[in-house]
Amino acid sequence: MLVTIQNAHPVGGTITAPPSKSMAHRAVLCAALAEGRSPITNLEFSKDISATLGAAAQLCARVRTGADDAVVEGLGHFVPLAAPVDCCESGSTLRFLIPIASLTGQAVTFTGRGRLMERPQSVYEALYREQGLRFEQSAAGLTVEGALTPGSYRLAGNVSSQFISGLLFALPLLAGDSTLHLIPPVESRSYIDMTRAVQAAFGVESRWQDENTLAIPGGQTYHPCDYAVEGDYSQAAFPAVLGAACGGVTITGLAPDTLQGDAAILDILRRCGARFTRTAEGISFEKAPLHGVDIDLADCPDLGPVLMVLGLLCEGTTVIRNAERLRLKESDRIAAMEAELRAVGGLVESEGGTITVQGCADRLHAPAGVLHGHNDHRVVMSLAVLSLATGIPLTVDDAEAITKSWPNFFEAIKPLGAEVEHVG
């Protein structure tokens, strides 16, 4: 799908952050593992969350959905699978479910789309092979079989925290106690603690034994509960960058006391010189001169694409470090954003996981043709921010990629001054 994005009027207005995708994944799975009825409110039925709901319904739950909520009724047991579990393009769905699949007593095959089956699963593969369990991965799908055993697990702390969270979901249900030893440095710690916090709401506990070791008692049971999903700082980063550059933007629906690692966007913007205030009504941005800073992406990799746009809008140089994982997302996000930003005159370079962006807002120009969304929701949304912040109309392909995380994105930005035309 092609869309053209441009300013209908000067940037300004109010936008409500969509529900947190990260928290919703976790709440749905905890509810599915709990015997009984768990209402989950404030849901956005993106493709990723729909994949997790669908998987829960296949494995161990009844799921009923409303306009912006769902009731997940855990059956208290796993059901025989009649078909593979389709994870669509959701890395969280796949990586969270692989250890859970070991509890089912059957072979479980996962399928996916896009680059999902190309994304590395070596952490799980090594663990499964070490325990003599089946782990077979190909472009067509991934099959696991066999029960994980309680005990001591060692994982690199600088790989995706999704592997750690996946084990956190399953290990409490084993008969014995387990420990997770994370080899430092431990990145995305906030996502690990988010998993633990959602589990705690459903009655399952773990604790940090020391800075890098999690103690997980076995023999636990998930209990149903009513769960309300917070607003999403990952998605709020897009209007936040726009507001920092242009002013006049207010974002509502974000909890001030949150475990979301991507809440770091506010500190990053503050360091860049952004001017904003937080009240009970939301976070309101005023226009202010922005300057480049040094950004560590280790704990907030999803912010990478929009921070590259931010770098163009700042005076001076922005350096983004520890961004290696961006190359293994729905696209190689570093290469994708480099290509598209250069097409409008952006000065961007990368080496490994370090990205250097030169502020050059006054040199940016209309591209020679269509920009590419690379089938990546965060690339598409970042390019929309670029268009609105600079006043340069942009036509972007693969725009349907937004349905992966924020299906209503184009409608949501219209009150901020966006005109979005579907052109093919």
Predicted regions and their residues:
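Short, structured segments at the rim of ligand-binding sites
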Residues: 1-424
